[in-house]
Regions:
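Active-site helix of classical SDR
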Residues: 134, 170, 178
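C-terminal substrate-recognition "lid" of short-chain dehydrogenase/reductases
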Residues: 25, 92, 131-134, 142, ...
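Residue(s) in the substrate-gating loop at a strand-loop-helix junction
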Residues: 154
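Short C-terminal tail/terminal secondary-structure segment
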Residues: 12-15, 105-108, 254-290
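Conserved glycine-rich cofactor-binding loop
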Residues: 22, 29-30
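Alpha-helical segment proximal to the catalytic Tyr-Lys
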Residues: 139, 183-187, 251
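Substrate-binding pocket helix/loop in short-chain dehydrogenase/reductase
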Residues: 109-111, 118-123, 223
Length: 290
C-alpha cells in the first residue's frame, strides 16, 4: 500500500509541474489561449487571463474560482499589458510565465491589394503585442531572477505561403524577438522561447477555411486530410507545449522554436490554406481571434 501511495504521489507531482507558479496568458478567452488556461490550472498554476473579449474572458475565469482572474487587455496598448502583469504580482505575488498568445489572422490576399492600415493592425497585434508582453514580463522577472516567456509564432513564421503577408511577417518577427530576448535575459535566469503551431482547430482557423467560425468539425476534417499524421491539431496540443516550456522540465530550453505541426514543415508545407481562405475571410470578417 505504501508503495502504491508513493507511486501516486510521484504521478501527481508529474502532472502538477506548475504548482505554485503564476502565469499571464494573453488571447486567453478562446482557442489556444483558453486551452492553455485550462492546462495551466490543471497543472497547479494561477493565471491572469488577458483578452480583449471581455464576456468570454469573464466566463472562463468564473469556471476556476480564485485560480484565474480576468483582465480586459488590448495587447497593442502598453498600459493595458503593463496592468495585466501588475495584476499577476498584486493578486498572486509573482510572475513565473508570460504567454504572449493574442492574435488575429489579418487580411488574406495579394500584397498589391493589402490595405496599409490592415497591415499596421496585424503587425501591432501580432508583433508589437509580443514585444510589450516581453518588455513588461522582463520588468518583473529580472529582479525576481527567474521566469519563462513564451510567444506564439506559427508555421507561417517558419515558412512562407501559410498565412497573410502581415501575419507571416509578424510571426517571423516573433521568432526573432524570442531569440533576441533569450540572449539578453538568460543571465537573469529568464528563458524565452516560441511555439510555432501548425494547422490548429480554432474559431479563427474555421473562419479562414470554411467562412464560419462554428464549423470546427469540418475544419478538423480538412486539416487532418492535409496532415502527415492524419490528425488535426487542437488547442490542447499547443497548451501541452506551453506547459512544458513554462515548467522546470524545460529548464535548459532557451531561444528555441517548438514547432507543433504534425510534420507539416518537414515537407515544405502547402499554400492551400491562404488561397482557399481568402475570399471567405473577407466575407466573414477579418479580425477573428485565436
Amino acid at each position: 500500500l505504501d508503495a502504491q501511495l508513493g507511486l501516486l504521489e510521484r504521478i501527481n507531482l508529474m502532472t502538477k509541474r506548475l504548482e505554485g507558479m503564476v502565469a499571464v496568458i494573453t488571447g486567453a478567452s478562446s482557442g489556444i489561449g483558453a486551452g492553455t488556461v485550462h492546462r495551466f490550472v490543471e497543472e497547479g498554476a494561477s493565471v491572469v487571463a488577458a483578452d480583449i473579449q471581455e464576456q468570454a474572458g469573464e466566463a472562463l475565469a468564473a469556471e476556476f474560482g480564485e485560480s484565474v482572474v480576468f483582465i480586459r487587455t488590448d495587447v497593442t496598448q502598453e498600459e493595458q499589458v503593463a496592468a495585466a502583469v501588475d495584476l499577476a504580482v498584486e493578486k498572486f505575488g509573482r510572475l513565473d510565465c508570460m504567454f504572449n498568445n493574442a492574435g488575429i489572422v489579418g487580411v488574406v490576399g495579394p500584397i498589391a491589394d493589402t490595405p496599409t492600415e490592415d497591415w499596421d493592425t496585424t503587425i501591432a497585434i501580432l508583433l508589437k503585442g509580443v514585444f510589450l508582453g516581453c518588455k513588461h514580463a522582463a520588468r518583473v522577472m529580472i529582479p525576481q531572477g527567474s521566469g519563462s516567456i513564451i510567444s506564439t509564432s506559427s508555421t507561417a513564421g517558419v515558412l512562407g505561403g501559410l498565412g497573410s503577408h502581415g501575419y507571416t511577417a509578424a510571426k517571423h518577427g516573433v521568432i526573432g524577438l524570442a531569440k533576441s530576448v533569450a540572449s539578453e535575459l538568460s543571465e537573469h535566469g529568464v528563458r524565452s522561447n516560441a511555439i510555432a503551431p501548425g494547422n490548429t482547430v480554432t474559431a479563427m482557423t474555421a473562419t479562414v477555411t470554411t467562412g464560419d467560425h462554428e464549423k470546427l468539425e469540418e475544419t478538423a476534417e480538412g486539416m487532418a486530410s492535409r496532415s502527415m499524421l492524419g490528425i488535426a491539431g487542437q488547442p490542447e496540443d499547443i497548451a501541452a507545449a506551453a506547459a512544458y516550456l513554462a515548467s522546470n522540465d524545460a529548464r535548459l530550453v532557451n531561444g528555441h522554436v517548438l514547432v507543433v505541426d504534425g510534420g507539416q514543415t518537414t515537407s515544405g508545407g502547402n499554400n492551400r490554406f491562404i488561397k482557399s481562405g481568402s475570399g471567405m475571410l473577407r466575407e466573414a470578417g477579418k479580425w477573428d481571434r485565436y
